[in-house]
Amino acid sequence: MGATGDTGGPRPGTESRRPGNVGNAGAAGQPVLTNPWNIMIKPRQVQRRGRRSQMTTSFTDPAISMDLLRAVLQPSINEEIQSVFNKYMKFFQKAALNVRDNVGEEVDAEQLIQEACRSCVEQAKLLFSDGEKVIPRLAHELPGIKRGRQAEEESHREAPFPKRGKVGLPGHVLSNDRAAAGMVWKPKSCEPIRREGPKWDPARLNESTTFVLGSRANKALGMGGTRGRIYIKHPHLFKYAADPQDKHWLAEQHHMRATGGKMAYLLIEEDIRDLAASDDYRGCLDLKLEELKSFVLPSWMVEKMRKYMETLRTENEHRAAEATPQT
C-alpha cells in the first residue's frame, strides 16, 4: 500500500500550478494535457497582454502624457496654491471689509475676496505665456484709470483729515504686472493736477454757495453706487473732507446719515452741473441730476473750506516749494 501511494500520479494541485504542464504525446503526436484546468491559463494570458498593449498605444500623444502627469500632481499643486493664498488672505479680507465700511453693508465682502483671488490666478498665467498671446487687461487696470487712482491717493494725502489707509500690494508687484502686460506708465510727477483758475478761487465760496455730498454727485453723474469713482475720474474737482464737527452738523440738519468713521466729502453743486453739461456727459442716459440734494453751509464751515482751498491751490504749492531752502 505504501509503495502504491509513492508511485501514484502527480497531485492535481501541483499540476495546476505549472502552466503548460504537458503529458506524454499521444499516438498522433499531439500533446495531451494532464490537467484540464490548464485550459483556462492561456486565454487569460493572451487577453491580459492584449489589454496592456492597448493601454500603451493609447497614450503615445505627448500632450496626453503630460496631462496625465498634471492630473496626478494637481492635488498637491492645489494644496500649495491654497497655502499661498492663505498667506495673503488677511490683506484681501482687510481690504474687503474696508470697502464694505466705505460703501455700505450691501457689499458682499466674500464675493470681493473670491474675485480678487481669481484675478490673481489669471494674472499668474502671464508667468507661463509664450510671449505671443496677449491676455486682455481688466478694466480697472487701464492706464487712464490708474493715473486717476494715483491722483486720488495724492489728493487724500493732502486732505486735512486723512482717509483710513487701505491695504494694497507692494509697489514692485504692481510694476511687474504693468511690465508683463506691456503697459506704458508715466510717473506721477509728469502729470500734476492743476488746481488753479476761477474754480479754485476761495472767493467763490460764501454762505449762498450750494454744496452736495460726494456720494450723491457720484450717482447723479451715472456712476452707480460705486463710491469714489467721481474722484478718480475727475481729480481736478474741489472736494472737502468733512471733519467730525462738520459731519455732526450735517447729520443734525438731515443732509446725511451718521457715518461713524466713514469719510464724507462735500462738492460744489455748480462744478457737478458744469460736468453734466460737458461733452463727456451730454446726452448720457445715466444722468440723474435729481439725486443732487443741495444745501448751504454755515459761515464757520465755509471759512474752513476757504482756507483748505487756499492751501491746495497750485500757485501756493509752487510758492511753498520755492520758499523751501535748498540744502
From Swiss-Prot:
Task: Cite a single Pfam family from the UniProt record.
Answer: DNTTIP1_dimer
State the source organism's domain of life. Answer: Eukaryota
What residue spans carry the region label Disordered?
A: 1-34, 146-172
Sorted keywords for this record are:
DNA-binding, Nucleus, Transcription, Transcription regulation
Q: Where is the composition biased (Basic and acidic residues)?
A: 146-161
Q: Look up the record and report any one GO term of the cellular component aspect.
A: histone deacetylase complex
Location(s) in or outside the cell: Nucleus
Q: Where is this motif: Nuclear localization signal?
A: 162-168
Q: Return one GO MF term.
A: nucleosome binding
InterPro entries from the UniProt entry: DNTTIP1_dimer (IPR041384), TdIF1 (IPR026064), TdIF1_C (IPR049121)
List all Gly residues biased stretches: 1-11
Q: What is known of its domains?
A: The N-terminal domain mediates dimerization. The C-terminal domain mediates interaction with DNA and nucleosomes. It contains a HTH motif that mediates recognition of the consensus sequence.
- What's this protein's function? Increases DNTT terminal deoxynucleotidyltransferase activity (in vitro). Also acts as a transcriptional regulator, binding to the consensus sequence 5'-GNTGCATG-3' following an AT-tract. Associates with RAB20 promoter and positively regulates its transcription. Binds DNA and nucleosomes; may recruit HDAC1 complexes to nucleosomes or naked DNA.
The protein's name is Deoxynucleotidyltransferase terminal-interacting protein 1
Q: Which organism is it from?
A: Rattus norvegicus
* Lineage of the organism: Eukaryota, Metazoa, Chordata, Craniata, Vertebrata
The protein's gene is named Dnttip1
